[in-house]
Amino acid sequence: MSVFLDHASTTALRKTAKTALNDALEMLGNPSSVHSQGRTTRELLEASRDALAQACGANRSEIIFNSGGTEGDNHAIKGIYWKQNQQDPTRRVIITSPTEHHAVLDPVSWLAANQGAEVHYVKLLRNGMLDFADLERLIDQHSSQIALIS
């Protein structure tokens, strides 16, 4: 028997999700168009947004669709950093792990190189786990300056 354990980058869709996706892919019409096919597609898109918002306990305006995880990580990391830094320019500290996925590490590095972010990496224990004492130290040391912890 084979067991697949790399669900970080891909996983099988549930049958109901696959059916819904296939049905949506058959629809014609750009959701930004004013013709009837576009309006029908827009209705499905907005109904999906409402369902996700309700399932997550979020506002519908907080549900943002993108093309995948890397794009989502970029939007989230940069958006949170910029928002925190805009509210308080001293909030430039990002705390992260050296074992984060590159979809996280790359925008963090970009913020350091281009936006003045100060990045601190949590130390790892010999077994590869995060050193939570070091994380606590970093939070205590930079508490008023933290923009983001990933």
What are the language-model segments listed below?
Residues 1-150:
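Pyridoxal 5′-phosphate
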